[in-house]
């Protein structure tokens, strides 16, 4: 790297040291909402001792609390903000009743999606109440694609095991019978009676039923949600609630984009659970980014929900999550910094990617401010990134690179975020970034470990390639003279466990195993981290035929899928079976 650094290469906006605004929200406002569409969703924690009415009183006229729950120490919840209110929070800070908050916004799909988005009624009638589960165990699946008419989902009385199906996308695919669940006020759902009515209208033909509904997620054979259900279901008479997460959030599986929708889905399921029952949630998704600790807002909200379910509803609540498949993907890196000794991190940004890319750096509070220089591919000069500021390069009108570097200390330590624009230009997004190796050089006055992680870039639903995942390489893995990447056989990377996983009560982590020499061993791709996976299941039946065979979208169809997302439903089946072992 060239040792010459421009003094003021980046246009910066200073932050206050005690700034409590989510850096992702500051970035969204600074970019004029270029990456996002729709309202701003958020997860919040109130100051201890305050009730949710204190937040309601502070919100704008068109802002709304979606749901909330009382934890052992404080109230947590989700809410919608208008863009005007979000911008005001950036300028003035959040209301005094807010202890902390994180935003989760809809990702803008710049590509023309005509023909793939179902037609939505102008107004979806509200559903204010519905039949609750009477089963001892309620299973909850948060995924994409629910084959409610599958023959193997039928109960002895002929009805489907799906108690309720909630499509959280406003452009829902559930047909005219669907209702908008309250108090959440978005998406649409169907109960068991309505699902069976739709199937009866189609002459008990699954394919015809899904086609008439416009349920596009099930109009192909390989559907992730269907495979998960097939691995999870057992002969026991459990009710199932299926929460279909918004398509826009699945386009880019960043941790922040998922949080509010997953928590809304959990409270939706809790409202249907019978007192004294147990609820087991199958979350087969993963995220790469996040602080990966038990002190984050996400972890605290999960813990509070488990406590609330037990105290207010007499419900035993268990989350089952995937360890993730990122151990070999080079999306995590760890650097040990010595005082005044620079370290290098190379971020390889792939070409022809239609999604923005995000990098997060996390380090302990005691290390203080880090000095960061950034160098674009092909440039001979690096730029110093100012601390305590939001910086845009090369200009606010052409934001190829954005760095959010607050001085504020969070419960998880210090952090900064780097956003790079898409590298594809064949559509209407106005700004693209240079593909290649973006080099970051870090130094500081303290000693400690800096963890780097990329946000997940999803290739695209329905087989439509849209995004490509970048890679991270530390200085030990890079020849600085030629930037040739070395590829040592060092095995899986540490800190690669899913960013949704946290070491708290009520969370079980499932990892993927494979058969080798007659024994089960952990797969190389299964995520590793400080949170230990306590449930291990076979996700590779053969060295030649990868994955586990399971349900397709229709009865009689089978597909193979692998990964820790396949281990999660097997872990759920083990938890809910009488003997504690998964039946065949």
Predicted regions: what they are:
Residues 46-47, 69, 142-145, 243-248, ...:
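Active-site-proximal beta-strand/loop segments in catalytic clefts of secreted hydrolases
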Residues 72-74, 81-160, 272-279, 288-321, ...:
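Conserved, well-structured beta-alpha core segment at the onset of a catalytic domain
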Residues 146-226, 385-438, 443-475:
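Active-site core segment of subtilase-fold serine proteases
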Residues 167-171, 189-201, 330-415, 423-428, ...:
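Extracellular S/T/G-rich loop segment that most often corresponds to the catalytic His/Ser-adjacent loop
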Residues 249-335, 355-367, 398-502, 554-569:
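Substrate-binding/access-modulating region of protease and related hydrolase catalytic domains
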């Amino acid at each position: 790297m060239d040792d010459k650094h421009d003094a003021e290469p980046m246009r910066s906006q200073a932050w206050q040291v005690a700034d409590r605004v989510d850096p992702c929200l500051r970035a969204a406002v600074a970019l004029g909402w270029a990456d996002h569409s729709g309202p701003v969703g958020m997860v919040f924690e109130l100051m201890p001792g305050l009730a949710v009415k204190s937040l309601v009183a502070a919100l704008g006229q068109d802002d709304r609390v979606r749901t909330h729950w009382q934890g052992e120490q404080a109230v947590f919840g989700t809410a919608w903000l208008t863009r005007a209110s979000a911008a005001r929070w950036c300028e003035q800070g959040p209301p005094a009743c807010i202890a902390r908050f994180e935003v989760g916004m809809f990702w803008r799909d710049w590509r023309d999606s005509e023909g793939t988005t179902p037609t939505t009624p102008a107004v979806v009638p509200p559903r204010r109440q519905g039949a609750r589960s009477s089963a001892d165990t309620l299973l909850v699946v948060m995924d994409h694609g629910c084959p409610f008419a599958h023959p193997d989902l039928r109960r002895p009385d002929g009805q489907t095991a799906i108690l309720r199906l909630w499509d959280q996308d406003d452009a829902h695919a559930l047909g005219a019978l669907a209702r908008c669940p309250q108090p959440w006020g978005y998406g649409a759902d169907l109960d068991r009676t309505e699902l069976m009515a739709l199937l009866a209208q189609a002459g008990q033909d699954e394919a015809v039923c899904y086609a008439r509904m416009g349920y596009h997620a099930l109009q192909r054979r390989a559907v992730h949600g269907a495979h998960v259900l097939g691995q999870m279901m057992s002969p026991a008479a459990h009710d199932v609630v299926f929460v279909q997460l918004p398509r826009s959030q699945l386009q880019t599986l960043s941790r922040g984009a998922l949080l509010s929708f997953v928590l809304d889905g959990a409270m939706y399921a809790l409202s249907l659970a019978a007192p004294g029952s147990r609820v087991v949630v199958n979350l087969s998704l993963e995220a790469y980014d996040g602080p990966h600790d038990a002190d984050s807002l996400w972890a605290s909200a999960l813990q509070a929900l488990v406590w609330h379910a037990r105290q207010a509803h007499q419900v035993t609540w268990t989350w089952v999550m995937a360890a993730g498949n990122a151990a070999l993907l080079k999306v995590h890196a760890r650097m040990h910094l010595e005082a005044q000794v620079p370290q290098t991190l190379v971020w390889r940004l792939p070409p022809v990617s239609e999604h923005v890319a995000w990098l997060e750096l996390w380090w302990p509070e005691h290390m203080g401010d880090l000095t960061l220089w950034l160098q674009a591919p092909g440039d001979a000069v690096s730029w110093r990134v100012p601390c305590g500021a939001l910086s845009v390069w090369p200009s606010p009108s052409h934001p190829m690179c954005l760095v959010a570097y607050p001085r504020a200390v969070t419960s998880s330590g210090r952090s900064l975020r780097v956003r790079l624009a898409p590298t594809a230009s064949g559509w209407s997004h106005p700004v693209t970034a240079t593909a290649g190796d973006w080099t970051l050089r870090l130094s500081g006055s303290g000693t400690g470990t800096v963890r780097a992680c990329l946000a997940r870039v999803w290739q695209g639903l329905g087989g439509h390639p849209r995004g490509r995942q970048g890679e991270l390489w530390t200085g030990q893995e890079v020849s600085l003279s030629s930037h040739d990447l070395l590829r040592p056989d060092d095995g899986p990377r540490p800190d690669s466990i899913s960013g949704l996983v946290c070491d708290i009560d009520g969370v079980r982590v499932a990892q993927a195993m494979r058969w080798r020499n007659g024994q089960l061993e952990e797969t190389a791709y299964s995520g590793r981290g400080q949170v230990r996976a306590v449930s291990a299941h076979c996700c590779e039946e053969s060295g030649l035929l990868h994955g586990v065979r399971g349900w397709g979208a229709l009865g009689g169809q089978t597909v193979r899928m692998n990964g820790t997302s396949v281990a999660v439903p097997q872990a759920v089946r083990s938890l809910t079976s009488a003997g504690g072992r998964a039946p065949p």
